[in-house]
From Swiss-Prot:
The keyword Heme does not apply. It comes from Mus musculus. One of its GO terms (cellular component) is mitochondrial matrix. Its EC number is 1.14.11.8. It catalyses: N(6),N(6),N(6)-trimethyl-L-lysine + 2-oxoglutarate + O2 = (3S)-3-hydroxy-N(6),N(6),N(6)-trimethyl-L-lysine + succinate + CO2. This is Trimethyllysine dioxygenase, mitochondrial. Binds 1 Fe(2+) ion per subunit. Pathway: Amine and polyamine biosynthesis; carnitine biosynthesis. GO terms for biological process: carnitine biosynthetic process. Converts trimethyllysine (TML) into hydroxytrimethyllysine (HTML). The keyword Magnesium does not apply. Transmembrane segments: none annotated.
Amino acid sequence: MWYHKLLHQQSRLRNLMKRGNIAQGLHLSNFKSLFSSSIHWCHTTSKSVNCTWHQHEDHLELQYAGTVMRFDYVWLRDHCRSASCYNSKTHQRSLDTASVDLCIKPKTVHLDETMLFFTWPDGHVTRYDLDWLVKNSYEGQKQKVIQPRILWNSKLYQQAQVPSVDFQCFLETNEGLKKFLQNFLLYGIAFVENVPPTEEHTEKLAERISLIRETIYGRMWYFTSDFSRGDTAYTKLALDRHTDTTYFQEPCGIQVFHCLKHEGTGGRTLLVDGFYAAQQVLQKAPEEFELLSKVPLKHEYIENVGQCHNHMIGVGPILNIYPWNKELYLIRYNNYDRAVINTVPYDVVHRWYTAHRTLTTELRRPENELWVKLKPGKVLFIDNWRVLHGRESFTGYRQLCGCYLTRDDVLNTARLLGLHA
């Protein structure tokens, strides 16, 4: 299950962070064979290679590095990395997949050192490095966590003492940017300190890691409690924990908050790790976790205030998981914007409400709540696909600015800096 992998990763990541080295901890150890067989295998051994394979009618079964893998012959032909099939400069496929015979079968298969060679009926030769096959096989991928994370409640996060990054260091050095992104990827939140309290400097900060995602709220948003938009956020009322833009088909990936001024009391920001809460549900009621990951719901935003007229609808389950490794990658939770439940059969509705209540109970546990007082100069970045946010009610005049960032661009920046994202 995905949480077992995450717990294992978290333990290794914490140990590595204590030693100042995180990159080496992202590789999983070899795992036991997923299949057993009594068939006759081709067997090749050397000082460095122990590899066996068997040719079936429509696929190759390969055992290497403690892994038993199965590869469809069409897949093996389609993924050929020869110069005529794959452009190594653009990293794009040149082969027309539709031209591959769906009944194709290699004439010969042989191993040379760590390379496995396939000769096809037309004489074309495909070769694969054994480690590449392990890395890209389904059996290999299902054992890997796509994005290593450290799940947290309030106590765990405070004990971690995750440092903020200085504004100038963030803007001017790759070291500062990498440190910030590493914290953000692991915890789903990160802070930048000593930012001049202006909308312009907040925008400059955001553009350092991503394109700003323009939405119905504009490019940069600036709001007070004047109810200038048809949203509870534009009031002084408390906001329960939620993720934003659940009414978009693809919710915004990252949001940025900067409190420019507050002349009053209250208004603390609430942060809850939705993945930590989901893990608790999976451990206590796995059938409810599964239901929340399969039942699609509509979320809706209807606005008719002044010149703003919008009707947005987004559809998806509360919990979104990768089907091959069951890893959670997105939580869509907003009781304010959830539309009429009309996508769920009668006999599932009550079970869904029960599962929703279980998740809500975990999200509302006081020990899972991290309260932060935002102030001028301190900018908060939130992974909107993971961490829920809210606020307590407040008095006085309060100005906030911020924006949404495109998730793909943030992850792109992280990968270019050598981070696992």
